[in-house]
């Protein structure tokens, strides 16, 4: 476990070698200084111990200020506390150069991403002036993921609620349409029944008129038959009267005949008497 911890805390040797050789080339520009492996390991371990001590001292100043994010001012105060004040000016100048380079890189990247985005360029330059807050970012990442997950769940819940409301609305509309259709069908049936009743009434009226016409025709037939009977009775009366007249004529004829007979008898009797 201790060996793994040393490996984890050990600084990258390539970076340590590059930093050391750059400084040595400034100190001895006439010749190239070679670095032994053990010397490189010693530089690496010394830098690690120095960084640990410097970070612990800077953390104390950060706690005194009641902040959770360490700033460059905390590191500067820690260097003064460790009696490295002579390194503050070159450290601050190198830090300003780093800020300018970093701001230029971010501005170029923002301009490439947003060609006409002046506001995006301004915001990127404003964020570049701030130091990196790696610790705070790591703490905020889980909360951001939780917030994103929660917002996603809320969106899904809202979508499901909207779908449920739409389904209920469609069902209600379908029921309303069915009720309207059923009412329309009932109204149509009522209209048809009303029309049929009207037709039945018209047929009844027509039948009534026909019955009235039949009754009138029957009355006319009765009157005609009565008139015919009256005419027949008159004719029979005329016949009886003619028969009576004929009878009276016959009687007169008979009487005349009887008179002639009696006359002839008298004539016969007178003739006999004359004889």
From Swiss-Prot:
GO biological process terms on file: regulation of DNA-templated transcription; response to heat; response to water deprivation
Cell location: Nucleus
Keywords, ordered alphabetically: Activator, Coiled coil, DNA-binding, Nucleus, Transcription, Transcription regulation
Main location: nucleus
GO molecular function, one term: DNA-binding transcription factor activity
Stated induction or repression of this protein's expression: Repressed by heat and dehydration stress.
Assigned GO CC terms: nucleus
InterPro entries: CBFA_NFYB_domain, DNA_Pol-Epsilon_Subunit, Histone-fold
Low complexity bias (residue ranges): 112-122
Residue ranges of the motif Nuclear localization signal: 135-142
Residue ranges the UniProt entry marks as DNA-binding: 11-17
Ranges in a coiled coil: 152-179
Disordered as annotated region, ranges: 112-275
Comp. bias intervals (Basic and acidic residues): 151-161
Comp. bias (Acidic residues): 162-237, 266-275
Complex formation: Heterotrimeric transcription factor composed of three components, NF-YA, NF-YB and NF-YC. NF-YB and NF-YC must interact and dimerize for NF-YA association and DNA binding. Binds directly with DPB3-1.
Purpose: Component of the NF-Y/HAP transcription factor complex. The NF-Y complex stimulates the transcription of various genes by recognizing and binding to a CCAAT motif in promoters.
Family per record: Belongs to the NFYB/HAP3 subunit family.
The protein's name in its UniProt record: DNA polymerase II subunit B4
Source organism (scientific name): Arabidopsis thaliana
């Amino acid at each position: 476990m201790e060996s793994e911890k040393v490996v984890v805390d050990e600084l990258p040797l390539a970076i340590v070698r590059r930093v050391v050789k750059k400084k040595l080339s400034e100190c001895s520009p006439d010749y190239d200084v070679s670095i032994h492996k053990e010397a490189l390991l010693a530089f690496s371990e010394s830098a690690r111990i120095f960084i640990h001590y410097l970070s612990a001292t800077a953390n104390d100043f950060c706690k005194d200020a009641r902040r959770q994010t360490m700033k460059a001012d905390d590191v500067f105060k820690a260097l003064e506390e460790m009696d490295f004040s002579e390194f503050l000016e070159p450290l601050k100048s190198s830090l300003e150069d780093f800020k300018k380079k970093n701001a230029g890189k971010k501005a170029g990247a923002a301009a490439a991403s947003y060609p006409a985005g002046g506001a995006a360029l301004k915001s990127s330059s404003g964020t570049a002036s701030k130091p990196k807050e790696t610790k705070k970012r790591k703490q905020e990442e889980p909360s951001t993921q939780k917030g994103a997950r929660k917002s996603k769940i809320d969106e899904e819940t809202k979508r499901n609620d909207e779908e449920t409301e739409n389904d209920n609305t469609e069902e209600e509309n379908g029921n309303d349409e069915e009720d309207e259709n059923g009412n329309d069908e009932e109204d149509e049936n009522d209209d048809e029944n009303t029309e049929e009743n009207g037709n039945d009434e018209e047929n009844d009226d027509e039948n009534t008129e026909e019955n009235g016409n039949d009754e009138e025709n029957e009355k006319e037939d009765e009157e005609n038959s009565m008139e015919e009977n009256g005419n027949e009775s008159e004719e029979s009366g005329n016949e009886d009267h003619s028969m009576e007249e004929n009878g009276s004529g016959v009687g007169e004829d008979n009487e005349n005949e009887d008179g002639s007979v009696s006359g002839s008898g008298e004539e016969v009797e007178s003739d006999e008497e004359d004889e």
